[in-house]
């Protein structure tokens, strides 16, 4: 199992999923030297400033249309 990665939610982009059950957010990695940020889909309540524990840090979600 890969190591866990902490990421901070910087922007809530919108709702996604067939019934709007997921939220698409932009996250910035906390321990990364390059201030890398990616877009992820999050299930459950989330808002800006929340800290997420990502099991997979390389996967990025497709953008909303």
Curated annotation (Swiss-Prot):
Molecular functions (GO terms): structural constituent of ribosome
Record carries keyword Transport: no
A Pfam cross-reference name: Ribosomal_S28e
Keyword Ribosomal protein applies: yes
Keywords: Cytoplasm, Endoplasmic reticulum, Ribonucleoprotein, Ribosomal protein
Compartmental location: Cytoplasm, Cytosol; Cytoplasm; Rough endoplasmic reticulum
One annotated Gene Ontology cellular component of this protein: cytosolic small ribosomal subunit
One BP term from GO: maturation of SSU-rRNA
UniProt-listed HAMAP family: Ribosomal_eS28
Family note: Belongs to the eukaryotic ribosomal protein eS28 family.
Subunit structure: Component of the 40S small ribosomal subunit.
Protein name: Small ribosomal subunit protein eS28
Native source species: Caenorhabditis elegans
Lineage of producing organism: Eukaryota, Metazoa, Ecdysozoa, Nematoda, Chromadorea
Gene: rps-28
């Amino acid at each position: 199992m890969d190591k866990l990665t902490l990421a901070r939610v910087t922007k809530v982009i919108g709702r996604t999923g067939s019934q709007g059950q997921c939220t698409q957010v932009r996250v910035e990695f906390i321990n990364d030297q390059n201030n890398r940020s990616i877009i992820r889909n999050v299930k459950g309540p989330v808002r800006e400033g929340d800290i997420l524990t990502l099991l997979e840090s390389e996967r990025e979600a497709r953008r909303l249309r």
